[in-house]
């Protein structure tokens, strides 16, 4: 293959490289600023109003110590792991099975069901009706109140359905001729061929459930069931609600308000940042396979 060395191509590569570097900096610098701020001297940090490339003063872990002083942090971490693991498994399984059903042209009501599902994405009933439904099902103050309302995503179902629709119909027909049922076709033929898209959907659900706090705030009163994000939210606003985490922590956060704010952001973000590099390779191919109909 002959490499194109024309002036126009060279200019394009230079501009493209500069744009990529700029986009990388836009994504990287905010998190770097937060990390540096979380280990900076609290007094100097309160006086700073510029981007940080290194810590202000001697590096300190006081912000993280103040966050860890909250007795609910460990239990909230365990709760969040439960919500992420169980919720992601249920959501991914439901998305795969529903996507398979809606992709079958032999299923008479697939278009009707798809319209009904899509309507739920476009029109929301609202917070009060949702609360009343959860209450009528006696799910208030239970883990299911956090898991069930956000169990499935119409967007993810659409991606999975489209990915399965692109598979050759002859594969499923030949399997049926050999006596395979829908469960066998889904698990042994369809799933191995759409596992890249499935991996992306799993990551979408995991990130969404890791960051979930609103349903917990709306449906939970038992602090032992609170997810991490809700506890961290309380830490951030503890100056206006001193009873949220206890007087000892509140006093510390009064003196280290900015430092603790940045430390909580890092605590909530690092787990997802650690997982992303291992799943990044699935993103482009998985989403494109499920989003573009061939």
Where are these regions (language model features)?
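A hydrophobic, multi-pass inner-membrane permease signature
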Residues: 2-294
């Amino acid at each position: 293959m002959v490499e194109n060395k024309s002036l126009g191509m060279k200019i394009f590569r230079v501009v493209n490289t500069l744009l990529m570097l700029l986009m990388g900096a836009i994504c990287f610098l905010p998190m770097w600023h937060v990390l540096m701020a979380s280990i900076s001297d609290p007094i100097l940090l309160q006086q700073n109003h510029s981007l940080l490339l290194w810590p202000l003063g001697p590096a300190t872990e006081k912000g993280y110590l103040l966050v860890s002083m909250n007795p609910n942090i460990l239990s909230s971490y365990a709760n969040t792991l439960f919500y992420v693991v169980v919720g992601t498994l249920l959501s991914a399984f439901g998305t795969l099975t529903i996507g398979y059903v809606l992709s079958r042209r032999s299923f008479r009501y697939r278009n009707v069901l798809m319209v009904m599902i899509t309507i739920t994405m476009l029109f929301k009933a609202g917070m009060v009706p949702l609360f009343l439904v959860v209450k009528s099902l006696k799910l208030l103050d239970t883990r299911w109140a956090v898991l069930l309302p956000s169990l499935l995503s119409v967007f993810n179902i659409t991606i999975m359905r489209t990915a399965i629709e692109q598979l050759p119909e002859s594969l499923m027909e030949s399997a049926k001729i050999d006596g395979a049922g829908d469960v066998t076709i889904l698990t042994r033929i369809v799933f191995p061929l759409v596992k890249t898209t499935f991996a992306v959907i799993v990551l979408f659900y995991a990130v969404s459930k890791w960051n979930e706090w609103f349903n917990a705030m709306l449906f939970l009163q038992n602090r032992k069931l609170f997810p991490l994000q809700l506890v961290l939210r309380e830490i951030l606003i503890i100056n206006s609600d001193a009873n949220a985490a206890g007087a000892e922590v509140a006093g510390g956060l009064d003196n280290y308000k900015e430092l603790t704010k940045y430390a909580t952001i890092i605590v909530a973000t690092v787990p997802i940042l650690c997982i992303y590099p291992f799943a990044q390779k699935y993103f482009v191919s998985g989403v494109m396979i499920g989003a573009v109909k061939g």
